[in-house]
Design a protein with these regions (language model features):
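Bilobed "Venus flytrap"/periplasmic-binding protein-like clamshell domains
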Residues: 1-34, 51-55
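A ligand-binding cleft/hinge motif common to bilobed small-molecule-binding domains
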Residues: 11-17, 38-41, 45-75
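Generic alpha-helical structural signal
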Residues: 14, 55, 91-95, 108
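Periplasmic-binding protein-like
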Residues: 51, 59-95, 117-140
Length: 146
């Protein structure tokens, strides 16, 4: 199993290994490209990483259709936006904008454009369907994270 040094995947795989009393042979790599090469060249059976990042990595392979992302996960790690803690006016603008984009369907269209459709100039399609966590946040917007 390939795991890129410095990522949260390192801690997740170690926690999983300990919780399930397993001995997983994992290869630490310097970057995503090296991890992908280990799997592509059959020197590793798997690559542990955020699903959306894996989708991007796989999409760049000439034989992308030979790889898949499992539905199972080692944990949930929400992405977020950061801005100054004491900037309530800016937070209000961000909240209003995001909620408006969700209500109008614009955010769903953007998601489809970038994750489910061919992306110029190479017309690569990540084929990355919206997961249940993202669907829930679109249905019930919150600044609390997942």
């Amino acid at each position: 199993t390939a795991v890129t040094s410095g990522t949260t995947s390192v801690a997740l795989i170690k926690e999983f290994e300990k919780a399930h009393n397993l001995k997983i042979r994992y290869l630490m790599t310097k970057d995503f490209a090296e991890s992908m090469q280990l799997v592509a060249n059959k020197r590793a059976d798997a690559f542990i990483l955020d699903d959306v990042l894996l989708a991007g990595q796989i999409s760049n392979l000439p034989n992308a259709s030979e790889f898949t992302i499992l539905d199972a996960s080692l944990g949930v790690e929400p992405y977020g936006a950061m801005f100054r803690k004491d900037d309530a006016p800016f937070k209000a603008v961000v909240d209003k904008t995001v909620k408006g984009m969700i209500a109008s369907g614009e955010l769903s269209k953007l998601y489809s454009t970038w994750f489910e459709s061919p992306i110029p100039p190479k017309n690569i399609n990540l084929n990355f369907k919206m997961n249940s966590y993202t669907k829930e946040l679109f249905a019930n917007p919150s600044d609390k994270g997942i």
